[in-house]
């Protein structure tokens, strides 16, 4: 699957995306082609197969902004390979680029995050982060100490992880529907 977004001057794009297919191979290509083009891209990926997601953000002109937030949940036999690349060529002054990537693994399989900042300009603000792990044992212990069984505690943590950074009620509703669908499965 390939998605291409092109933003011109003074435009704004907000993408809230949820994937939960068995095998996902996806490319999201974002071209910021006009001054003051701004993009907020939020991806939630539930991996139950071998998933590969590539996100490429091209800051093709000065004074552009991208905020990329990719969250993955690896369950059952699922793996996630997440590649996020931001490109800021020379001359694209005052560009702002942020990447925040996290995968929560509910299995023992390998997941990868490759955050790349390819920057040829000095006058920019850019940051990236990548985290792969499981839920914090202290959080799980706290919920269990309050009488919540482990399965329910994990369900609450998964729900919170998938809904964070989302402000669209329809997407939150969709996650609730997914939760019902997967309720019979063991995470």
In which residue ranges do the predicted regions lie?
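Conserved beta-strand/loop scaffold segments within soluble protein domains that form the structured core
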Residues: 1-148, 161-164, 170-187
């Amino acid at each position: 699957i390939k998605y291409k977004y092109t933003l011109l001057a003074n435009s704004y794009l907000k993408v809230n995306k949820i994937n939960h297919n068995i095998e996902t191979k996806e490319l999201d290509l974002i071209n910021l082609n006009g001054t003051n083009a701004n993009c907020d891209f939020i991806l939630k990926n539930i991996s139950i197969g071998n998933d590969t997601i590539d996100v490429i953000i091209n800051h093709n002109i000065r004074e552009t902004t991208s905020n990329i937030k990719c969250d993955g949940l690896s369950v059952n036999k699922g793996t996630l390979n997440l590649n996020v690349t931001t490109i800021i060529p020379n001359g694209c002054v005052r560009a702002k680029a942020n990447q925040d990537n996290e995968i929560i693994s509910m299995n023992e399989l390998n997941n990868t995050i490759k955050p790349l900042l390819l920057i040829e300009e000095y006058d920019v603000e850019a940051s990236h982060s990548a985290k792969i792990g499981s839920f914090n044992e202290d959080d799980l212990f706290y919920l269990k100490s309050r009488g919540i069984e482990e399965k329910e505690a994990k369900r609450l943590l998964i729900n919170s992880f998938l809904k964070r950074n989302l402000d669209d009620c329809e997407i939150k509703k969709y996650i609730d529907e997914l939760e019902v669908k997967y309720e019979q499965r063991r995470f």
